[in-house]
């Protein structure tokens, strides 16, 4: 886990970056460093409230993200999902359970892609096959931004 922050205005931001297993698992010997990728979530904070940009993929990463948001001391008002891949929204449920007044939002195109990622072809044959029991049981889709 790595975090960076800025505090140059009334708004400030913090970034949480997590290293996770990549999607390619059959690399040649000696290229193991290429078997991981980084995911990040950005918390944009005002005086009392915050907006989170993207969640993380696995149950463990989602708990790390939730703990990080709670530790900020801010009220999570919204979660903006930037695109429809599971590694950007599979962590919604735990955050929305802890912050029930928060809204998860995305563009209509992203919401459509999120629904596709939850289809059996993607969820069972891709995400759960690659990440086994690491994917959260409860998965949610964001509301369309108006």
Where are these regions (language model features)?
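Active-site metal-binding motif and surrounding structural segment of the metallo-beta-lactamase
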Residues: 60-106
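Surface-exposed, flexible loop/turn segments at secondary-structure boundaries
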Residues: 21, 87, 110-112
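Short hydrophobic-aromatic micro-motifs
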Residues: 51-53, 104
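Structural motif
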Residues: 49-51, 78
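Glycine- and other small-residue-rich loops at beta-strand/loop junctions that grip anionic moieties
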Residues: 54-55, 84
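A mature extracytoplasmic/lumenal domain signature
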Residues: 55-57, 108
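Zn-dependent metallo-beta-lactamase
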Residues: 1-48, 57-60
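Metallo-beta-lactamase
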Residues: 4, 111-146
């Amino acid at each position: 886990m790595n975090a960076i922050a800025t505090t140059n205005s009334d708004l400030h931001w913090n970034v949480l970056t997590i290293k996770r297993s990549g999607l390619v698992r059959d690399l040649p010997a000696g290229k193991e460093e290429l078997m991981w990728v980084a995911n990040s979530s950005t918390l944009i904070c005002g005086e009392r409230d915050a907006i989170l940009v993207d969640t993380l993929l696995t149950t463990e990463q989602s708990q790390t993200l939730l703990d990080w948001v709670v530790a900020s001391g801010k009220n999570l008002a919204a979660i903006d999902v930037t695109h429809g891949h599971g590694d950007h929204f599979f962590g919604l449920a735990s955050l929305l359970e802890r912050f029930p007044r928060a809204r998860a939002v995305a563009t209509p195109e992203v919401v459509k892609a999120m629904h596709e990622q939850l289809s059996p072809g993607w969820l069972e044959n891709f995400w759960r096959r690659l990440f086994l029991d690491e994917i959260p049981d409860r998965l949610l889709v964001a509301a369309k931004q108006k």
